[in-house]
Amino acid sequence: MREIVHIQAGQCGNQIGAKFWEVISDEHGVDPTGAYHGDSDLQLERINVYYNEATGGRYVPRAILMDLEPGTMDSVRAGPYGQIFRPDNFVFGQTGAGNNWAKGHYTEGAELIDSVLDVVRKEAESCDCLQGFQIAHSLGGGTGSGMGTLLISKIREEYPDRMMMTFSVFPSPKVSDTVVEPYNATLSVHQLVENADEVMCIDNEALYDICFRTLKLTTPTFGDLNHLVSIVMSGVTCCLRFPGQLNSDLRKLAVNLIPFPRLHFFLIGFAPLTSRGSQQYRALTVPELTQQMFDAKNMMAASDPRHGRYLTASAMFRGRMSTKEVDEQMLNVQNKNSSYFVEWIPNNIKSSVCDIPPRGLKMAATFIGNSTAIQEMFKRVSEQFTAMFRRKAFLHWYTGEGMDEMEFTEAESNMNDLVSEYQQYQDATAEEEGEFDENEGAEGEEQPADY
């Protein structure tokens, strides 16, 4: 019941995905060969959310791995859980997208997409009641961004009523991996606004800061960063996989978090994050988890929630705790920091409690917030985009693959619209009545306000 099909695209997506399957397999007691060596029936009760049961009791991930070059997949295959995946579910090309969104979306990616969709169909058909898809990819490269968004739009056509959740790695503010990141990211966001249901925004720099500042790792590797992402990915779906007192699933999450359809880009966080040596010196309590969870330093994307306001938020607790205490803490957060929550959505934190904590912890919490501060991220990318696009720098790489400049202009204005929508709701108060009419043009000046 309620299966989720997992797709990882491009180098970044495959590396995050590989880490994610290590975390999930560990939680469910599945070893690298797919055999079950767990210690509790609860691990098996709803293992089919993420796994197919094959012959001989092997558990095989419902995962589809795609890339336009074989390199990363070979390293996934050689990694600790490489043998657990179904060999037919590796779909790769030989050419690479060369950090070019157009190659991933229109030329190279378009050639490979049908074979990916065949695998998606096969996985979806083996589901009892498919809940939705989760996609791990980055927005700065070529494959994850270009081909990833192509796949999302194709799946959207074929499964319009299924949830589409993405874990999208945005370009970092100070660290740039490729020069054309702003182009690729803007073109991708243009797609995600229209076709995804929930986008969890991640960025490497914020992850580095967490590793460095909170976990006290002197030289964080991508493996460390990806581990952070994967515990959040696991936390988001723990309610589907383990029994809980207050459940949530992808659809409940969306209904509670998305007040306006376009504003579905979320900040994510996790608690407790402690350095390896200091764990035994603190007892975990719900208040402590709540405090750390809402801490700006804990956000996995480089935007500071203190610069905006929360439209909505969701807190998913794991472990044995009283729901009363959870409710009290949530109320407490909203009362103490009321200026950081919009007042026109009362009680805007959804909480859920799942009984089984992650391995090695007594309790943990996953945080998902819909904050207007996320506009900082889009603004930053948009500024870099405009700087290059004004001079038409690097554009020939894209037009050479058959793209039109028009598409860039559209993507740019779509992203700027998104920023101003966030800003509009950040400034809004409960009193302005005429403001939120469907026709955004009528900004409340035309019709007389009836107070």
Curated annotation (Swiss-Prot):
Residues 426-451 are annotated as: Disordered. Mg(2+) binds at residue 69. GO terms for molecular function: GTP binding; GTPase activity; metal ion binding; structural constituent of cytoskeleton. Its main location: cytoplasm. It is found in: Cytoplasm, Cytoskeleton. Its cofactor is Mg(2+). One of its GO terms (biological process) is microtubule-based process. Keywords: Cytoplasm, Cytoskeleton, GTP-binding, Magnesium, Metal-binding, Microtubule, Nucleotide-binding. Coiled coil: none annotated. SUPFAM superfamilies: Tubulin C-terminal domain-like (SSF55307), Tubulin nucleotide-binding domain-like (SSF52490). One of its GO terms (cellular component) is cytoplasm. GTP binds at residues 11, 69, 138, 142-144, 204, 226. Dimer of alpha and beta chains. A typical microtubule is a hollow water-filled tube with an outer diameter of 25 nm and an inner diameter of 15 nM. Alpha-beta heterodimers associate head-to-tail to form protofilaments running lengthwise along the microtubule wall with the beta-tubulin subunit facing the microtubule plus end conferring a structural polarity. Microtubules usually have 13 protofilaments but different protofilament numbers can be found in some organisms and specialized cells. Belongs to the tubulin family. Tubulin is the major constituent of microtubules, a cylinder consisting of laterally associated linear protofilaments composed of alpha- and beta-tubulin heterodimers. Microtubules grow by the addition of GTP-tubulin dimers to the microtubule end, where a stabilizing cap forms. Below the cap, tubulin dimers are in GDP-bound state, owing to GTPase activity of alpha-tubulin. This is Tubulin beta chain. It comes from Naegleria pringsheimi. The lineage of its organism: Eukaryota, Discoba, Heterolobosea, Tetramitia, Eutetramitia.
